[in-house]
Amino acid sequence: MMKFCSQCGGSIKFEVPKDDDIPRFICTQCDFIHYENPRVVVGSVPIYKDQVLLCLRAIEPRSNYWTLPAGFLENGEGLADGAVREAEEEALIKPIIGPLIAVVDVIHAHQVHVFFRAHLENLEFGTGKESLDVKLFKLSEIPWEQMAFKTGKIALRAQINKSEDDWQPVYKTLP
């Protein structure tokens, strides 16, 4: 919860600004309106032949559960560049980013998750700081019950259900 204005240090009130319909943090001194918008999570579905690379999370939330390499987009970074960076950080891979595969609104967390299909040219991978293990799984052997997040499951199912010629991305909303 915001207590002070980042522009002038003044106190903050939470109310609906004039000509708006959503409550916002507003400075009582300089009238600056502080907009809070959803955060973007970017990730990839790294494929090597008929296998997908998953990371066993070393951090909360959902430590010790499998996930796709993904994380928050940084300022000044494009979606695909962010997906590559996250894959490098979590699995020590350099994926070739392909088509957009899934976009998921995660309303309760104020996030939008964006996943790309990614190609791995070789078997060079390892555990980054946020991973306990990194492993390739055949698409028929994905550990669905041990997956960390619904959004990762949605992206994986989109990968499984796509043909090489069908790359219309999946769009879902989670409450």
PLM regions and their residue ranges:
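Short functional micro-motifs and their immediate structural scaffolds
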Residues: 12-14, 35
